[in-house]
Amino acid sequence: MEEKQIDYTAIKDIPASAWEKLSQKKIYFGHQSVGFNIIDGVNDIIKENPAIKLNIVETSSPSDFNKGVFAHSRVGENVDPESKTDAFIKIINKLEHHIDIAFFKFCYVDINSQTDVNKVFNHYKETMAKLKNKYPKTKFVHFTIPLGTTKITLKTRIKMLIGKKDIWELDANIRKNEYNELL
C-alpha cells in the first residue's frame, strides 16, 4: 500500500490526530553537539503547540522503546563522520525492530576542505542500504550537512572579483555542498 503524502504549510495546519499518530511512533535521532540545539528547538515548538505530545528522552536503550518515544543520543565523534555512521548502525542493530523512524545528522564540522566527500558518502550510502534491507519496516530519514558561515574578508572578495576558482575560505562549504548533492 502506497503512503499518502500530505503537505502542510504551517504547524497550526497539522490536525491533532496527526500529532497523536506521531506521538505513538518510536523514533530515534542520533547526533552530536548541534543535535541538542535541535532538540531544544523541538521542545520550544511543543511548548507553543499543546497538541504536540512527543515523549522526548535522551536514550538508546531498547527498554525505552516499548511505547511511543522520540529518543535521541550522541553518535560518534565530531570531525569524524564515519564514526557517526558506524555508531548509528550499532545503535540501530541494538534497537532492532523496535523503531519506526530513525535518522542521524552530521555536523557542520564533519566535512572540511580536506574531506574525501565520496568516501564519506559511499560509507553512509552502504550503511543505510544495509539498514534498509535488514529493517524494511523502519523509515530512515536523511539529512543534508549544514553549511558554515564564512567571514568574507577583503582578500576573499578580491579573489572572488578576479574569478579565482580555488578560494580556501570557501572550500569547506564547497565540500559540504558536494556531499549534499550526492545525497
Segments predicted by a language model, with ranges:
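Substrate-gating cap/lid alpha-helix
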Residues: T150-L183
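Alpha-helical scaffolding within the catalytic cores
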Residues: A10-I14, E82-N93, K125-T127, P146
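Loop/turn elements at helix/coil->beta-strand transitions in domains of secreted/extracellular proteins
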Residues: S23-K26, P50-N55, H97-A102, N133-V141
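Generic structural signal for well-ordered alpha-helices
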Residues: Y124-A129, N180-L183
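N-terminal module-boundary/linker segments of secreted carbohydrate-active enzymes
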Residues: M1-I52
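Soluble non-cytosolic domains of exported or imported proteins
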Residues: Q32-F36, E82, Q114-N122, L170-N177
